[in-house]
Amino acid sequence: MKISYNWLKEYIECDLAPEAVAEALTSIGLEVDSLEQIEEIPGGLAGVIVAEVVECVDHPDSDHLHITKLNTGEAELLQVVCGAPNVAAGQKVLLATVGTVLGEDFKIKKSKIRGVESFGMICAEDELGIGESHDGIMVLDPEAVVGTPAKDYLGLATDALIEIGLTANRVDAASHIGVARDLYAYLKHNDIPCKLNIPDVSAFAEGEGEAIPVEVLAADGAPRYTGTTIKGVKVAASPEWLQKKLLAIGLRPINNVVDITNFVLHEIGQPLHAFDLAKIAGGKVVVRRAEEGEKFVTLDGVERTLSSADLMIANTEKPMCLAGVFGGEESGVTESTTDIFLESAYFNPVSIRKSSKRHTLKTDASFRYERGADPLVVEYAAKRAALLIQEIAGGQIVGKVQEFYPEKIEKKVVELDYNHIENFVGKKIGHDVIEGILENLAYEFIEKAETGAKVAVPSYMVDVYRECDIVEEILRIYGYNNIELPQAMRMSVNAPQKPEPEQVRKAVSDFLAANGFVETMNNSLTKSDYYAKLKTFPEEKCVRIMNPLSSDLNVMRQTLLLNGLEVIAYNINRQITNIKTFEYGSVYSFDPEKDGKTLDSYEEHTCYALFISGQPEKSWRTDPGKGNYFQLKGYLELLLKRFGCDIYSLETEAAPADIFSEGLAYNLPGSHQPLAVMGTIAPARLKQFGIKQPVFAAEINWPALLELVKRNKIRYKELPKFPEVRRDLAILLDESVSYADLRKSAFRVGKKLLKQVGLFDVYRGDKIAEGKKQYALSFVLQDLDKTLTDNDVEKVMSKLLSTFQNEFGATLR
């Protein structure tokens, strides 16, 4: 936003230079992006001075040139050759000395004109840029003082353009008076002499006769609307002072009436609009919503299609203005206008913002309205503009000001606690200082007490609602630089959760990604039909959506497994048959035994799900084989071991048959808390999703995995110095005996020397009786203190075989 320094000084009397003003504004939150010096004439006529023609004679080699000698206030006279017909001795003139630059690039140089040296140029009006006459040189008042710079003699104005990077919440400062108010509060707080001057509108008086009536049909869009009828105006060019003000901030003067509305906008911050009274059909102004598809031609000549949400200023026949955004081509003020209707209103910010965005129109008016204009300045702005119109364009106010204002808009009231404010600020700044700053910012004190106060917020402070907002106001005037840094830091220290869930999650995801799994993300909403025939996840435990978008998204998922099968089916249907995916996400359930009105009726927790299906592409190096049950089991157990889990210490049971045709469920020992479930997806579930190839899946209970990590204590031990010994054993067993039982017994017997037990072959078939199976087991033994002898190894192996025979009926093969 652009602010003219000279214009600003009309509202605040102070002795601050433009640079000091810019620094002050930045310190109070109105950050100055740039400060540019502006001169009425580029260059400020530097090098041009008042001189006296002491002698003037004709040039001996010309019929029109003159040789003059001028007094410039120096000891010696200056010789200048001049061709002006009106130059004469005794005149006071403006002399451009050698080195002066006139206009953009005309530099005065020492020259020789027809053999006579010339040391400057006596100037005409057009050469100086202060007029258009070139009939002769400018002849000054005889009282002009020789040596006076032309800038001072002519009274050329200099100005400074202050460019403020206005934030969206500071629409109160989107005007010269708005900036002056803030600057006044700053200067008063710092005891710098200043005075705030707000233009007086007490001379405004309503006239006789009938004013144009106003009807508001869209009160939600225009909570306050006023119209002033002025007749007998003379539309012409604006006076020089008004044009200069607008030009200083980059606005193009149009005519006196339009220029006044723009002037008041940038003076007060209230947008105004003037209509040609003769173009208001039916003699009535109507504020209404547009009809859907209605056509309207704006001031830029573009025909726009309106929406029923657009707020319009219309007559009885058609729209005249897109309210708060842009005027219409047909209703604007022109040179033939004699009577006008002056609008000043407060429009709904949301309505204006949507219309501005819908029609891609950004104007000075919409900029202010969509951020929240001041509803209480509407009347003042109308009076200010009407008085200026009468002063500059003539005319008389007709009838009463027409106003629609059904519900009075009150100022916001905020209660303050001084101790709370000082704690928030971090410094005891004093109650009198707080009150002084707020009074300088025009806050009204409704109640005062020793501990606090109740204040009415100025209507133009649209972003102030709460005590913390007022603290910000106090701080920016008091000065952030005046708040000393504390010598001690007071803070609460929260011990980080151990283990940190995000770190564990990252480790799990990195592990899976490193092993070829691709992460997927699915919608938490799914269809209830998936759960219709499940016992593990019954449909009645689904959390139902009250207003579902469709029947496919009517419940929250109870498990990640079904969503994962959707992904697999989707990929298989697109010829991607080799699949390894995982997902991390939340699952939800409802307790049907509770009423559902309280949070304890619902449960949410997170899970990991893993899926393997299909066969990887063959390589010249190896045949990877098909994805299978044991491949998935290996990944799952490797993952659990990664976080310190002893797989064989977990409690296991069969996986639920309605989800898996075969599989295992792992529970934490002691607590029976479910940790993971894995297996081959049941054919019924595959059919449900149209999948015709085997799918192997696992689901990990995330809270249980975190509990497992929490239990895990890292222990360090010295690397073994003595060699390992491996022995193999083939035994015949009943089908009912599991490898886990054998392993547990083996470690119980050989716990001192036995380090590893492995199953490397399972055989069923020829020469093996029905109901029997053969296990080939490997055993790794090691003593940390010495090298094992054959005798040591044989003793352990004998004990193992004896245990297997006695406990499981094993037979050595």
Please report, for each region that a protein language model flagged, where it lies by residue.
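Mobile "lid/hinge" segments at catalytic clefts and subdomain interfaces of large enzymes
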Residues: 114-129, 133-139, 150-160, 164, ...
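Phosphate-backbone binding interfaces of nucleic-acid-interacting proteins
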Residues: 1-205, 341, 364, 372-375, ...
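Extended, well-folded interaction surfaces typified by the phenylalanyl-tRNA synthetase beta subunit core
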Residues: 414-582, 727, 780-784, 792-813
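A carboxyl-terminal module marker
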Residues: 2, 19, 439-446, 467, ...
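Beta-rich nucleic-acid/ligand-interaction surfaces
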Residues: 40-44, 203-205, 264, 492-493, ...
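Terminal amphipathic helices with adjacent charged low-complexity linkers/tails
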Residues: 183, 187-217, 393-421, 427-428, ...
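Glycine/proline-enriched, intrinsically flexible loops and inter-domain linkers
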Residues: 5, 23, 28, 40, ...
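Conserved mixed alpha/beta core segments that line enzyme active sites in large multi-domain catalysts
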Residues: 49-79, 147, 243, 255, ...
